[in-house]
Amino acid sequence: MALNLEKKQEIIKAFATKENDTGSCEVQVALLNERIKLLTEHLKANPKDHSSRLGLLKLVAQRRNLLKYIKRTAHARYVVLIEKLGIKDR
């Protein structure tokens, strides 16, 4: 269910703004996006898992808030990020 270390490091490397960057908004959004994908697949197989559904909703809200922050502070970075992740602009 959780991201394995190799996948996580791959995502961090792809979205880091500088070397050893693990906490920037872009990296956080990319990691959340991957966790959301994994949880979505889990919920397709287990539709009655309501605690996981609640966790998914929390992750989506967290990603949405981070995306709003990036859009407000650095719109160019926001556009690049949503294109890379394949997320729709709201």
UniProtKB/Swiss-Prot annotation:
GO terms for cellular component: cytosolic small ribosomal subunit. One of the primary rRNA binding proteins, it binds directly to 16S rRNA where it helps nucleate assembly of the platform of the 30S subunit by binding and bridging several RNA helices of the 16S rRNA. GO terms for molecular function: rRNA binding; structural constituent of ribosome. SUPFAM superfamilies: S15/NS1 RNA-binding domain (SSF47060). SMART domains: Ribosomal_S15 (SM01387). The keyword S-adenosyl-L-methionine does not apply. Gene3D superfamilies: 6.10.250.3130, S15/NS1, RNA-binding. GO terms for biological process: translation. Pfam families: Ribosomal_S15. PANTHER family: RIBOSOMAL PROTEIN S15, BACTERIAL AND ORGANELLAR, SMALL RIBOSOMAL SUBUNIT PROTEIN US15M. It comes from the Bacteria. Belongs to the universal ribosomal protein uS15 family. This is Small ribosomal subunit protein uS15. Keywords: Ribonucleoprotein, Ribosomal protein, RNA-binding, rRNA-binding. Part of the 30S ribosomal subunit. Forms a bridge to the 50S subunit in the 70S ribosome, contacting the 23S rRNA. It comes from Helicobacter pylori (strain G27).
